[in-house]
């Protein structure tokens, strides 16, 4: 499956300051997958103490879900991420930026009060889109 999205060209606003797009266009007729929020819980029920380790597990879980639908991280069009403190923003962003440098999706990062278990410091949910034929390169719509 081919990714069904492309960044929306934008002018007149500050450029993204990390690996994300201000806007992402999804092709008509694309198949969508909505992933529930993934926590840093390993298959062996362990939780790394650090945000970066938890983010790696979150994205590995997302990758497994997308593979079940015949997709990959390259198909992600939107990320909503939640961390429990400002100190977790940079470690989360390092993982996200490394994984999405080539195909930066639209992305939001929020600081929240906590999750279902105190040891969780990051939760990630995504939307992915795919079509059999990729979007043609064309001028943006007015």
What do these predicted ranges mean?
Residues 1-60, 64-77, 83-142:
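N-terminal presequence-like segments and the immediate start of the first folded domain
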């Amino acid at each position: 499956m081919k990714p069904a999205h492309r960044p929306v060209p934008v002018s007149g606003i500050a450029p993204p300051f990390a690996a994300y797009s201000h806007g992402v266009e999804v092709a008509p007729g694309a198949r969508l997958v909505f992933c529930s929020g993934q926590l840093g819980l390993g298959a062996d029920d362990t939780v790394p103490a650090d945000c970066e380790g938890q983010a790696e597990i979150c994205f590995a879980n997302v990758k497994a879900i997308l593979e079940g639908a015949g997709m990959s991280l390259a198909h992600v069009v939107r990320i909503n991420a939640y961390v429990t403190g400002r100190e977790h923003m940079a470690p989360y962003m390092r993982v996200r930026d490394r994984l999405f440098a080539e195909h930066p999706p639209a992305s939001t990062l929020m600081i929240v009060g906590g999750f279902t278990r105190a040891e969780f410091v990051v939760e990630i949910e995504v939307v992915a889109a795919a079509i059999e034929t990729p979007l043609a390169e064309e001028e943006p719509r007015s």
